[in-house]
Amino acid sequence: MKEWNKKSALWMLLYAVLYAVGTAIVCVTGAITPVLFVCSQITAGILLSGIIIYAFRKVKAPGVAACLGLAMILLLLLIQDAVAWHVIPVIIITVLAEAVRAVFKYNWTGDVIGTVIMTFSSFGYYGQIWFNRDYTYECAVEEMPAGYADGLMAASPAWSLIVVAVAGIILSLVISNITAKLFKL
């Protein structure tokens, strides 16, 4: 499928649902331990890249990232967590991924870069540990077991943002290439 039609739209619905479910899994793993919360981008690189690159390669036309971003926003609405900290990054990342794909004329390079960008769609969820630490700490104290908040702060020094982002990017590139080889994209 190179462009939008009824068949590609139905497949995109499936990709969007898989993307939303994968994103939910990424977010839920953070409840297991503070280290997994800090490593959310790494988990996203592993769990979401295959879905995203598959969708991008199957529909080489505008709107694919928008469908995935919309699925993410619908998920946030469903779980009643559609706050600015979460929704605005999704919108920015979606627009950026669409723009990159368009600039590269929907070729492999643009799709891989777009995939890496889209794996950051849940950054507003976990990025607060670096940019809104007091709020994150308060939420962790209220919502998580005793000691989780302190563990989260200990596991997220400023430098860890760079390590997590780079690892997430590398894993996204690797998973995209593995997916392409497995599914002959």
Residue ranges and their predicted role:
Residues 29-38, 100-109, 181, 185:
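Membrane interface segments of multi-pass transport proteins and intramembrane proteases
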Residues 16-24, 70-79, 117-128:
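Aromatic-anchored segments of alpha-helical transmembrane domains
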Residues 21, 90-126, 176:
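Short helix-perturbing small/polar motifs within transmembrane alpha-helices
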Residues 2-60:
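Hydrophobic transmembrane alpha-helices
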Residues 6-15, 40, 44, 63-68, ...:
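Alpha-helical transmembrane segments of integral membrane proteins
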Residues 112-184:
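Membrane-embedded alpha-helical hairpins and interfacial helices in multi-pass inner-membrane proteins
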Residues 40-98:
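Alpha-helical membrane segments and adjacent membrane-interface helices in multi-pass membrane proteins
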Residues 1-6, 180-185:
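Short, charged juxtamembrane terminal tails flanking transmembrane helices
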